[in-house]
Amino acid sequence: MKKIVYLALFLGFALTNTSCNSGKKAQVINTFVKTYFPDTEVIANIKDGLDCDVTLSDYTQIGFDGNLFGKLEWDEVDCRHTSLSTTVPAALVPTEISNYVNRIHGSQSITKIAKDNRGWDIELSNGVEIEFDKRFNVIDFDD
């Protein structure tokens, strides 16, 4: 019982004492935005549990996945609703995925990318969605 109380206190402190607007999380977000979207600024920054959801001035949406140790890493970039028909920065797209898109869908650009522990999901400018496993094999294709 004592362990459960301590765990509940720890989790409660960890979840309430972290913010996306200050500290290390804000620094990670600001560095990411300045690096990959230098002509924009953050207009909304919403904390969702340990995660942070950010909207930029061009309406790009970025999801950051957090953990109990304060680490924050991007897990989704969505440029589909931007005011400037922006594509996902090439530096965020693994080479294997870029090569596949260029080879098979040459004239299309990547407008959304998401990653998790199973692999990667992308959406192209023509609306085609492609899912890759960790080894960058195509495992699902939805047009």
Question: Positions of the model-derived regions?
Answer:
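Bacterial Sec-dependent N-terminal signal peptides
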Residues: M1-V28, V33
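Hydrophobic transmembrane signal anchors and adjacent membrane-proximal interface regions, especially
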Residues: K2, T16-T18, T31, F69-L72, ...
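A generic structural signal for short, solvent-exposed coil/turn residues
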Residues: G12, K34-Y36, I46, N102-H105, ...
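Short, non-transmembrane alpha-helical segments in secretory-pathway proteins
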Residues: S22-E41, S85-S109
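Surface-exposed charge patches in extracellular/virion surface proteins
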Residues: K34, G66-N67, R103, R118, ...
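Exposed beta-strand-loop-beta-strand "reactive/processing" segments of non-cytosolic proteins
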Residues: E41-F64, T111-I130
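A broad structural signal for short, well-ordered beta-strand segments within beta-sheet-rich domains
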Residues: E41-V42, F69-L72, G106-A114, V138
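Amphipathic N-proximal alpha-helical interface segments
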Residues: D53-T82, N126-D143
